[in-house]
Amino acid sequence: MADAFGDELFSVFEGDSTTAAGTKKDKEKDKGKWKGPPGSADKAGKRFDGKLQSESTNNGKNKRDVDFEGTDEPIFGKKPRIEESITEDLSLADLMPRVKVQSVETVEGCTHEVALPAEEDYLPLKPRVGKAAKEYPFILDAFQREAIQCVDNNQSVLVSAHTSAGKTVCAEYAIALALREKQRVIFTSPIKALSNQKYREMYEEFQDVGLMTGDVTINPTASCLVMTTEILRSMLYRGSEVMREVAWVIFDEIHYMRDSERGVVWEETIILLPDNVHYVFLSATIPNARQFAEWICHLHKQPCHVIYTDYRPTPLQHYIFPAGGDGLHLVVDENGDFREDNFNTAMQVLRDAGDLAKGDQKGRKGGTKGPSNVFKIVKMIMERNFQPVIIFSFSKKDCEAYALQMTKLDFNTDEEKKMVEEVFSNAIDCLSDEDKKLPQVEHVLPLLKRGIGIHHGGLLPILKETIEILFSEGLIKALFATETFAMGINMPARTVLFTNARKFDGKDFRWISSGEYIQMSGRAGRRGMDDRGIVILMVDEKMSPTIGKQLLKGSADPLNSAFHLTYNMVLNLLRVEEINPEYMLEKSFYQFQHYRAIPGVVEKVKNSEEQYNKIVIPNEESVVIYYKIRQQLAKLGKEIEEYIHKPKYCLPFLQPGRLVKVKNEGDDFGWGVVVNFSKKSNVKPNSGELDPLYVVEVLLRCSKESLKNSATEAAKPAKPDEKGEMQVVPVLVHLLSAISSVRLYIPKDLRPVDNRQSVLKSIQEVQKRFPDGIPLLDPIDDMGIQDQGLKKVIQKVEAFEHRMYSHPLHNDPNLETVYTLCEKKAQIAIDIKSAKRELKKARTVLQMDELKCRKRVLRRLGFATSSDVIEMKGRVACEISSADELLLTEMMFNGLFNDLSAEQATALLSCFVFQENSSEMPKLTEQLAGPLRQMQECAKRIAKVSAEAKLEIDEETYLSSFKPHLMDVVYTWATGATFAHICKMTDVFEGSIIRCMRRLEELLRQMCQAAKAIGNTELENKFAEGITKIKRDIVFAASLYL
């Protein structure tokens, strides 16, 4: 039905289909003058303005015309197809997840819903009989009681609540229950540091607990295993025995699933887990918790409860501190009401302080002028007894700079100083004497003794843990941290201070999102200790009340899938018998979220089709044919315009005084006069070539309002009833919608307003002289364009115009009315078509094309056969999950590692695991530069194969993802240098070096396994030697939590 408006009828010339270029421009040869695009003359005109009138009444068919009057069935009359299409689309219901959601009850600010398979009836939860698996010394909150009841009934539950609300209670209960029933339980967390802390907590509570993080394995046969999600994923792919005995899996911080890089691991894991396992998901507040539960229910055919609460045990007060001011403004009170008047006062202070505030930023090089704002606030917090405070900054450098400004202050008593020293010396006791003298270790102690701490990724892990312990013991009163501190670790303070409301997210500076603000500000207010938490936001540039309100009162970020394919995933799924990569795509949360849109689209199609059928057009066939002719003319007009706009044709005619018509999207300026034109070169973003841009300066009638505020580029046309002001506006060539054959005389000096306005009078004179519209330059006769393509288009135009004039409708008095109806109906047809495309897309599994491309790459590189059977190379790549498995496998099979020493191989592998940016590129010696070049050659080959397989890949970006910045550092460390020595070789933070080394050790272990898989003992021993070379001293000092 909808394709009734296609143009396949209109191949006017045999074997030459009309080129689809666009809409709306046509032309007519009239008395030898090219009269320009439709609509350019007044309605009365004899020019094509939607309809052409012509003296020609030749009804005889032109040879070249297609005799289509009889072949075209009534476009709108294909009723049956409509009905069929709807029913066909409704069969999508089979695809739709069959899940229903039942609301259970809502008690004391906590909602409880359950998602269950559509064919099951909801059975109310049974109250517990007998003793609880674990007793608590305090009264449980409503949401904790509800969640525990789900666990007692052996049903999965997602608990979504604020950080300090006490979600861990629900997890502990599930562990206690599993241990009592002699079942195994797995607790997974997103980061190793968090796993270590959780292990510590669980071990103190239950004893029968083990830990597996890739770095460390403790008691792997325990009934309760704490592990990172990556380890669980690889256990599932390996078909580990452990999985057979597991009854419960607890996912901590499930909102981490939206992490663009590692979130996919959660999804894979949840999909791979067997249906008989039950789950406890702990999450920060997410608005779409119910959707997640529906997915779990759809995936594992079991009910999944959602317990959601916005409750905060300690309410928060939010203040703004405007830079340059000296006081706090309460903008959200403890009841959660936004106080707009206070917000506006704060912004007023900011405006008044204006330039003063700008000068107060700390200089990166020198000190700051006088005490900084941060210093003022922290001092005030201490005086008012609002400590402990966490001060969040968005860069490691800022953290340290602010902390160093505090050195004049001292928040600890002598007693506390002694304790700090004792904890500190015990913590670093395991380090060698040399490592104890590292600058970072020596510098941090004096700060800690004063009750000031620093916490960011660049710190040595052992210092980071020491600081966490001191903070939780109340020995640090002011902690300067980056946002990673807000991840998971339950270490609340009384006050949270943001040093800035903007952050750099790798691409640009932006306001922090309300979700990030909620996560970080949630650290304020300690349960049972503070009656309220205090959050202070420092603002140094004006924000509108809308942005302010959105930030301070916005909702949490939804949990959206970050699922994407990886080669390791595809290969592992090809290796495992009972599951394939297609299954993984179909079952992903990504696909599920996509399916949820289907009912809306079906509804849209239905409504549009009803509207469509309501529009009745008399003599429909004939009207549609006429409509199509006009559409076709419009399209051809656009093509002609494209020829005219080619700089080589139009530039010679853009002399000063030439009348041109300017139209920019919705803004139609009408006729103006060319003043000048210039050529600007524009660098193309991807190729770096110069692309000349031609800018024409045109004198146009603009609205005075639009000229007030900014550059002339922002000028808007004057409204019909307004006099407007003539102004010279720079216009890109393609915005000229018509070029006239008329030229006017323009005054030499256009600065005086009167001179400019005089030109407007001249233009109006010309318009009076040509009531049928100002004559345009004829592309062939005037502009002398000899292009064969253009001649063809003009021939087609003549044929169509002839056809239009001879159409019975053309001179019909009701033409406009029926034509408008026809246009409306055609638009609905287009909408239906696009909605159906949407439906079709909704049925297809997303990313399936990418999967095909990836399989193509695997076949071409010899990792798998054409029938998806995994080859030797593929089995090797399955062993490597923490770095680029394709490239490493290729390097191994090409013998790239064979001639390298263990130290060289280790240094080369560091490129795969170092992820930060370093400003300086090390000067590499040939023994490192050689292997690096070979690796890059190998990577280029993979990029080439990927591009040939139609994968979107940019060779530059791909190559730059391997960062050689620490190669020399790792090489020197592997040859036995001290940590102090390698720190001096680079500007990378100590903590980042250690993180790189620990990742490297994990990769080396995987490389050992990979070498073992091909039976290359020599290579296996080389990688193992690499491990022993780097695994020493402070780099691998054990975590204090273990």
Swiss-Prot record:
Compartment(s) where it occurs, according to its Swiss-Prot or TrEMBL record: Nucleus, Nucleoplasm; Nucleus, Nucleolus; Nucleus; Nucleus speckle
SMART domains: DEXDc (SM00487), DSHCT (SM01142), HELICc (SM00490)
Entry EC number(s): 3.6.4.13
UniProt activity-regulation remark: Activated when MTREX is incorporated into NEXT complex an the nuclear RNA exosome complex.
Gene3D superfamilies cross-referenced by the UniProt entry: 1.10.3380.30, 2.40.30.300, P-loop containing nucleotide triphosphate hydrolases
Gene Ontology molecular function terms on file: ATP binding; ATP hydrolysis activity; RNA binding; RNA helicase activity
UniProt xrefs under InterPro entries: DEAD/DEAH_box_helicase_dom, Helicase_ATP-bd, Helicase_C-like, MTR4-like_stalk, MTR4_beta-barrel, P-loop_NTPase, RNA-DNA_Helicase, SKI2-like
Catalytic activity: ATP + H2O = ADP + phosphate + H(+)
Domain of life: Eukaryota
UniProt effect for mutating residue 697 to R: Decreased interaction with NRDE2
Motif DEIH box, residue numbers: 252-255
Region described as Disordered: 16-74
Positions bound to ATP: 139, 161-168
One GO BP: RNA catabolic process
Helicase ATP-binding domain segment(s): 148-304
List of residues that carry N6-acetyllysine: 51, 78
Pfam families in UniProt: DEAD, DSHCT, Helicase_C, MTR4-like_stalk, MTR4_beta-barrel
Enzyme class: hydrolase
UniProt keyword terms in alphabetical order: Acetylation, ATP-binding, DNA damage, Helicase, Hydrolase, Isopeptide bond, mRNA processing, mRNA splicing, Nucleotide-binding, Nucleus, Phosphoprotein, rRNA processing, Spliceosome, Ubl conjugation
Residues modified as Phosphoserine: 40
Sequence similarity: Belongs to the helicase family. SKI2 subfamily.
Name of the protein: Exosome RNA helicase MTR4
Taxonomic source organism: Homo sapiens (Human)
